[in-house]
């Protein structure tokens, strides 16, 4: 597996003023420099290869991660042409018809880049970066918000703007992994190096937020066993790590947990609020995979394993278990009865992956493989708007892919 971490540059004065920068060569402001320092403490050891856009705000951020980052102009932000230096809000308001045209690949920013040119540039650069990344190694790429959003959207299977994702935070980490020909989103918009409070940052500013947290570690997780409906409790590590999150999740209307011990125990450790139980949040029914390691599953059910996890989201896990599509629909049914509320829900890796895939309407061609399973205690946030769900973060927390047996 190859891993690439995409990082948005630190803040600039233009970011603070909310104006379009495009290809303008702007430096970091004081806050941006502090953000880059905090980022370096978290990720500087993650990869020997660091690539960066050649624009100053990105290369300056990259300089905190490597003494010799590789500069690439193909990693630049989209060229917004005549909009450069203009207020983002004002241009959206006065050019509504123009931005509606972003759905068309032939649209071109006035004296700037076309949608098709930019998407092609992002695709080619993704291919280049992964080709330069060795198997079982990590690469760090410092680039820009629109570039990262496009890379994530394309990986999730979308092709037409606007993609169902939220605003990307300065110095946030978004990770894409590649197994042979399959690319998956492992992490999106993670900036907890700036503040622990940002673990569920959309909940701090949005009226309606759906936040998922995967349960803490169990012995089965540690041993690489697919536990599904087996009702395991947290192990010592799971209890310790969940306890560290106490008090961070505030101002939710409802706290809901799967009935299984590992999920309910996790939510009880991070909040003192009343917890409701919902069977709709149980882990996926793994059918004949239940209680087996990945190696054992591959020995007995290799074709079913590959098809269910990477090819067809309607294929049942373990022959007679549950599909990604079915698990996602049951969570959607739960949420539809709880509209206009802030929800914090403790659930399981397969169910969270399935729910988010379904809620953002990942295209069928990528619905099985859009996301990796989130890590233990990984936090993901969705924001509903205009009868749609927008992904604002995924698998916020630890960097790297914990599911070692699954990875092998």
Named regions from a protein language model:
Residues 12, 147-148, 218, 351-352:
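Short active-site segment of divalent metal-dependent hydrolases/proteases
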Residues 65-124, 187-189, 233, 270-330, ...:
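Phosphate-handling substructures
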Residues 64, 150-154, 269, 354-358:
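Active-site signature of alpha/beta-hydrolase-fold catalytic machinery across serine-
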Residues 143, 213, 346-347:
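A conserved hydrophobic position in a structured secondary element of the catalytic/binding core
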Residues 126-130, 330-336:
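A short, acidic, amphipathic alpha-helical segment used as a generic capping/interface helix at domain edges
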Residues 22, 30, 34-37, 41, ...:
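Extended, hydrophobic interaction surfaces within ordered domains
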Residues 2, 72, 78-90, 131, ...:
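Acidic, low-complexity terminal tails and accessory targeting/binding regions
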Residues 2, 7-71, 113-115, 119, ...:
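Active-site-proximal alpha-helix that buttresses catalytic centers in soluble enzyme cores
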């Amino acid at each position: 597996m190859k891993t690439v971490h995409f990082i948005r540059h630190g803040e600039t004065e233009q970011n603070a003023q909310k104006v379009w920068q495009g290809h303008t060569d702007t430096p970091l402001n004081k806050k941006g420099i502090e953000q880059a320092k905090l980022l370096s403490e978290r990720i500087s050891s993650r990869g020997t290869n660091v690539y960066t856009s050649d624009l100053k705000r990105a290369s300056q951020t990259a300089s905190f991660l490597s003494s010799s980052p590789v500069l690439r102009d193909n990693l630049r932000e989209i060229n917004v042409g005549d909009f450069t230096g203009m207020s983002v809000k004002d241009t959206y308001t006065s050019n509504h018809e123009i931005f509606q045209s972003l759905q068309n690949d032939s649209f071109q920013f006035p004296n700037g880049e076309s949608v098709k040119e930019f998407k092609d540039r992002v695709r080619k650069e993704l291919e280049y970066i992964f080709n330069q990344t060795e198997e079982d190694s990590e690469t760090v790429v410092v680039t820009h918000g629109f570039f990262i959003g496009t890379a994530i959207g394309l990986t999730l299977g979308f092709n037409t703007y606007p993609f169902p994702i939220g605003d990307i935070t300065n110095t946030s980490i978004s990770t894409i992994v590649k197994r042979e020909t399959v690319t998956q989103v492992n992490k999106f918009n993670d900036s907890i190096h700036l503040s622990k409070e940002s673990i569920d940052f959309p909940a701090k500013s949005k009226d309606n937020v759906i936040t998922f947290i995967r349960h803490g570690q169990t012995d089965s997780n540690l041993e690489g066993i697919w536990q599904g409906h087996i009702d395991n409790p947290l192990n010592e590590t799971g209890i310790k790590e969940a306890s560290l999150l106490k008090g961070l999740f505030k101002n939710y209307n409802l706290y809901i947990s799967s009935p299984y011990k590992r999920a309910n125990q996790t939510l009880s450790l991070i909040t003192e609020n009343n917890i409701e139980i919902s069977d709709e949040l149980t882990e996926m029914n793994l059918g004949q995979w239940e209680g087996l390691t990945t190696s054992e599953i591959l020995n007995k059910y290799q074709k079913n394993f590959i098809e269910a996890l990477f090819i067809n989201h309607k294929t049942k896990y373990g022959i007679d278990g549950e599909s990604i599509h079915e698990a996602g629909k049951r969570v959607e049914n739960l949420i539809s009865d709880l509209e206009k509320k802030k929800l914090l829900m403790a659930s399981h890796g397969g169910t969270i992956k399935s729910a988010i895939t379904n809620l953002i309407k990942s295209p069928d061609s990528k619905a099985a493989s859009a996301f990796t399973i989130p890590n233990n205690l990984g936090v993901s946030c969705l924001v509903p708007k205009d009868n749609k769900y927008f992904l604002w973060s995924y698998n916020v927390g630890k960097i790297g892919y914990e599911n070692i047996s699954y990875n092998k």
